[in-house]
C-alpha cells in the first residue's frame, strides 16, 4: 500500500507556541522522524524570512530636498541617515497599496514614527522609532509612499521612470519576520530514543504573530509541494457494516504487541491474556501490579505509552469486547 509511505511516519503529538513578548515566539514540535527536524526547520525558516507579505515605505519626498545626498538646515541627521531610519519603520497595512502618509513637525525635538499621520488601514507599529532630530526653529515635512510586497526590494527597483524630482526611493524590507533560528534535539517516544525535537524562535515586527507566521509559511510549502504529487490516493474499500459508528475509540482494536514495549512488559501482558489495548485500559493499576513479574517500572512504561495515545488505565469501555473483534481490527487498522 503506497499510503504507508506517509501514513506510518510519526507525526508530532506536541506542537506548542509560547511568547515572551509580542514580537518573539518559540515553537516546540515533537516527536518527528529522524532527520525531519532539520528538513522542516530549514524549510520553514527560509520561507518565513523570504516569502511572507508585509508593508514598507517605498519612497519619501522631503520638502526642500532634491536628492538623498542633501542636508537640511536645523536637522541633525543628513538625508542619507534619515532614509536609513525610514527603512526601519514597522507598518501594518490591511489593504493593497500604494498609500500616502505625511509628517510635519517643528523643533526642537525628535521626529518619531508615531508623529506620522496615517490613513485608515495603515498602522505604525514602532511609534517611538526616531526618524530625525530637529533643532530650535527647524521645521520638516515628509510624505511617504507605502506599499505591500514580500522579501527585500532595493531602492533602484522602487524608482519609477516618471518619478518627480525630489522623490527619493527607499530600500523596502517587506518581510514581517525579522529573525528565525532553530535547533534539533533528540526526544523519546515510547521505547524509541532518537526521534527529533524541533525548537524554533521567530522574531517579527509585530504586524503578525509568530504562530500565524509559521502557519502561513507551512501553507506556502504545502501549496508548492502539492504540485509534485502526481497520483490520486487509492480509496480503501470498506464493507458497509464497517461504516457503522463504533461505541469506542478504534485505537482500542490495536494489539498490545504493536506498542513497542520492553520484553518484560510485553511478556507480562501476554501471560495475563491481554491482547488488545481495549483489554489493557480496563485494568486498574492495582490489578496490573498483581500480575506475576510485573513491577512499578513496567507500570510506568505502560502508563506513559497510553498517555501518548490519550488513554489511561482504569477506563470503562462500553460493548467490550465486541463480536468479530478480529474483523473489526482489520477494517479500522488505518484509523489508529
From Swiss-Prot:
One matching Pfam family: RNA_pol_A_bac
Catalytic activity entry: RNA(n) + a ribonucleoside 5'-triphosphate = RNA(n+1) + diphosphate
Enzyme type, top EC level: transferase
Entry EC number(s): 2.7.7.6
Region Alpha N-terminal domain (alpha-NTD): start-end pairs: 1-232
GO cellular component terms attached to this protein's record: cytoplasm; DNA-directed RNA polymerase complex
GO MF term (any one): DNA-directed RNA polymerase activity
Oligomer status and interactors: Homodimer. The RNAP catalytic core consists of 2 alpha, 1 beta, 1 beta' and 1 omega subunit. When a sigma factor is associated with the core the holoenzyme is formed, which can initiate transcription.
Family affiliation: Belongs to the RNA polymerase alpha chain family.
Comment, domains: The N-terminal domain is essential for RNAP assembly and basal transcription, whereas the C-terminal domain is involved in interaction with transcriptional regulators and with upstream promoter elements.
Free-text function comment from the UniProt entry: DNA-dependent RNA polymerase catalyzes the transcription of DNA into RNA using the four ribonucleoside triphosphates as substrates.
The name this protein goes by in its record: DNA-directed RNA polymerase subunit alpha
Species of origin: Mesorhizobium japonicum (strain LMG 29417 / CECT 9101 / MAFF 303099) (Mesorhizobium loti (strain MAFF 303099))
Lineage start: Bacteria, Pseudomonadati, Pseudomonadota, Alphaproteobacteria, Hyphomicrobiales
Amino acid at each position: 500500500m503506497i499510503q504507508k509511505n506517509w501514513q506510518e511516519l510519526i507525526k508530532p503529538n506536541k506542537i506548542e507556541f509560547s511568547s515572551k513578548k509580542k514580537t518573539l515566539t518559540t515553537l516546540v514540535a515533537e516527536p518527528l522522524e529522524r532527520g525531519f527536524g532539520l528538513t522542516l526547520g530549514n524549510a520553514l525558516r527560509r520561507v518565513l524570512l523570504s516569502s511572507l507579505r508585509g508593508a514598507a515605505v517605498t519612497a519619501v519626498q522631503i520638502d526642500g530636498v532634491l536628492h538623498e545626498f542633501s542636508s537640511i538646515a536645523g536637522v541633525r541627521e543628513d538625508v542619507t541617515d534619515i532614509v536609513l531610519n525610514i527603512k526601519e519603520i514597522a507598518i501594518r497595512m490591511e489593504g493593497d497599496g500604494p498609500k500616502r502618509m505625511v509628517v510635519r513637525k517643528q523643533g526642537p525635538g525628535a521626529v518619531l514614527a508615531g508623529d506620522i499621520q496615517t490613513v485608515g488601514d495603515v498602522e505604525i507599529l514602532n511609534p517611538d522609532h526616531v526618524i530625525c532630530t530637529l533643532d530650535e526653529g527647524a521645521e520638516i515635512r515628509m510624505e511617504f509612499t507605502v506599499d505591500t510586497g514580500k522579501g527585500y526590494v532595493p531602492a533602484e527597483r522602487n524608482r519609477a521612470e516618471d518619478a518627480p524630482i525630489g522623490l527619493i526611493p527607499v530600500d523596502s524590507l517587506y518581510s514581517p519576520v525579522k529573525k528565525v533560528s532553530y535547533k534539533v534535539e533528540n526526544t523519546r517516544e515510547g521505547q524509541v530514543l532518537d526521534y527529533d525535537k524541533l525548537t524554533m524562535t521567530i522574531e517579527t515586527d509585530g504586524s503578525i504573530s509568530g504562530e500565524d507566521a509559521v502557519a502561513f509559511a507551512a501553507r506556502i510549502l504545502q501549496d508548492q509541494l502539492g504540485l509534485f504529487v502526481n497520483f490520486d490516493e487509492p480509496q480503501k474499500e470498506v464493507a458497509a457494516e464497517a461504516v457503522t459508528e463504533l461505541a469506542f475509540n478504534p485505537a482500542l482494536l490495536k494489539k498490545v504487541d504493536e506498542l513497542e514495549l520492553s520484553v518484560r512488559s510485553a511478556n507480562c501482558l501476554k501471560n495475563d491474556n491481554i491482547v488488545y489495548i481495549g483489554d489493557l485500559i480496563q485494568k486498574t493499576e492495582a490489578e496490573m501490579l498483581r500480575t506475576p513479574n510485573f513491577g512499578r517500572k513496567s507500570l510506568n512504561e505502560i502508563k506513559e505509552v497510553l498517555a501518548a495515545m490519550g488513554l489511561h488505565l482504569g477506563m470503562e469501555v462500553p460493548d467490550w469486547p465486541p463480536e468479530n473483534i478480529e474483523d473489526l481490527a482489520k477494517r479500522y487498522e488505518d484509523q489508529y
